[in-house]
């Protein structure tokens, strides 16, 4: 049975660092990063680069549906494309899709494929290629969540029909899922349609895809690939200047890859840190108290101190990078404003209310953030202490409602569907 939780969306909408997962960014972002490295007249560099190399995990698949996060997914952004691509404001722009229609009565999208598009081997992209990739994505760890409401995917001539279980007018924002050529899925580098293609001739590298349908000028003709055995060796290769681009996740449990000197490029993501309030316990069963707490977190300071500025403070569950973000409705943080709200909620009686803020101890970033939030909220009657637990115990406490406040993380879909936060039978944390 589903249980209702109240998520006070004291949000920190995160960016990823490319250059020191930009899983929601389009290839233009990484092209810009590559170009910057070669623009030595405008940037000071200790060493002028004569080649550019990216890491890959030896023995692991580059299949964009099943590959691991990080290095392999970064390569995939250069080799594969989806039906749509998200721009910098998270708006879906046609890529392999030329156009689409939506039948609201039948909850069905009909997507017409762009004509003349071929894979890097010269073979035509077909509707069945798209269907096969999307069906595989339905059962994958990375994409199954965003396709959970899909009831049917089928080819119809040169089009793809996707039927949903309910109405969703923004579903195409979820369809930046990479498409690979059917029958090549088991290859280490399946065949794609992107600007580059894998080649083993003369050493592992990415070569320009001569048949790329977009035909844009690319910053590099060849990108060398450096084999690494694991993420630690990827970090070492970056610091040794064997590779020139490193994916960094400042919020991960393992933050050993961060962060020395280098040039940083941010790409907005849909990852959101938020504070969950247990409305089944006092004092958060009182709407006035919940409103007060939303004013008591200095989001900007958390981003500055613990994300090194690589994030966006948000008061609503939408990235501020999105055109949908209601910036005009924001309330500026102030200690006086928080104090006034506590007084209005009757929490200035002198009687201490001890509360616990639950957090996953495996992320040092979240523990530090939780401690700062707890200190900021501890005013007048409220005294908030942090309870950090190993992940499994953290999830158990969250599912059992054994908390007053909880610092959580979620990766939203680009259509900003909040149902996973408002009604869920699982812990709202992705570790």
Name each region found by the language model:
Residues 68, 98-142, 283:
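Aromatic- and charge-enriched surface segment that lines or borders ligand/interaction sites
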Residues 114, 207-212, 267-292, 296, ...:
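A bilobed periplasmic-binding-protein/Venus flytrap-type ligand-binding module shared by bacterial periplasmic
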Residues 163-164, 168-222, 232:
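Gly/Pro-rich hinge or "lid" segments in bacterial periplasmic/extracellular proteins
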Residues 285-375:
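Append "and occasionally in soluble cytosolic enzymes with long acidic Gly/Pro-rich linkers
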Residues 345-412:
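Ligand/substrate-recognition segments at binding pockets and active sites
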Residues 423-430:
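Conserved small/polar residues in nucleotide/adenosyl-binding loops
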């Amino acid at each position: 049975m589903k249980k209702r939780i109240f998520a006070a969306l004291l949000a920190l909408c995160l960016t990823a660092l490319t250059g020191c997962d930009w899983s929601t960014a389009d290839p233009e972002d990484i092209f810009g990063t590559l170009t910057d490295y070669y623009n030595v007249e405008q940037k000071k560099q200790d060493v002028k680069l004569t080649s550019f190399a990216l890491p890959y995990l030896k023995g692991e698949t580059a299949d964009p549906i099943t590959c691991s996060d990080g290095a392999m997914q970064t390569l995939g952004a250069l080799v594969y494309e989806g039906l749509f691509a998200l721009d910098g404001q998270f708006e879906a722009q046609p890529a392999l899709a030329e156009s689409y229609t939506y039948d609201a009565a039948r909850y069905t999208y009909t997507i017409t494929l762009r004509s003349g598009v071929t894979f890097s081997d010269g073979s035509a992209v077909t509707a069945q290629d798209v269907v096969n990739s999307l069906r595989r994505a339905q059962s994958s760890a990375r994409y199954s969540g965003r396709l959970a409401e899909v009831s049917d995917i089928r080819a119809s001539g040169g089009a793809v029909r996707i039927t949903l279980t309910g109405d969703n007018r923004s579903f195409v924002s979820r369809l930046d899922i990479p498409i690979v050529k059917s029958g090549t899925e088991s290859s280490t580098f399946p065949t794609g349609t992107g600007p580059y293609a894998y080649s083993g001739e003369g050493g592992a590298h990415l070569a320009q895809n001569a048949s790329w349908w977009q035909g844009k000028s690319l910053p590099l003709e060849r990108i060398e690939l450096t084999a690494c055995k694991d993420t630690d060796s990827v970090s070492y290769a970056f610091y040794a200047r064997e590779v020139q681009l490193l994916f960094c996740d400042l919020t991960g449990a393992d933050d050993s890859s961060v962060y020395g000197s280098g040039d940083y490029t941010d790409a907005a993501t849909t990852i959101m840190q938020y504070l969950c309030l247990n409305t089944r316990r006092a004092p958060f069963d009182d709407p006035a108290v919940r409103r007060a707490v939303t004013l008591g977190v200095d989001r900007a300071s958390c981003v500055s101190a613990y994300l090194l500025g690589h994030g966006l403070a948000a008061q609503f569950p939408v990235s501020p990078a999105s055109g949908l973000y209601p910036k005009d409705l924001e309330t500026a943080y102030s200690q006086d404003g928080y104090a006034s709200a506590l007084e209005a909620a009757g929490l200035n009686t002198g009687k201490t209310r001890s509360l616990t803020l639950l957090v996953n101890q495996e992320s040092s970033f979240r523990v530090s953030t939780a401690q700062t939030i707890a200190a900021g909220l501890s005013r007048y009657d409220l005294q908030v202490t942090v309870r950090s637990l190993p992940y499994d115990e953290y999830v158990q406490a969250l599912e059992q409602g054994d908390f007053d406040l909880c610092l959580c993380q979620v990766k939203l879909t680009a259509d900003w569907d909040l149902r996973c936060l408002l009604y869920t039978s699982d812990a709202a944390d992705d570790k």
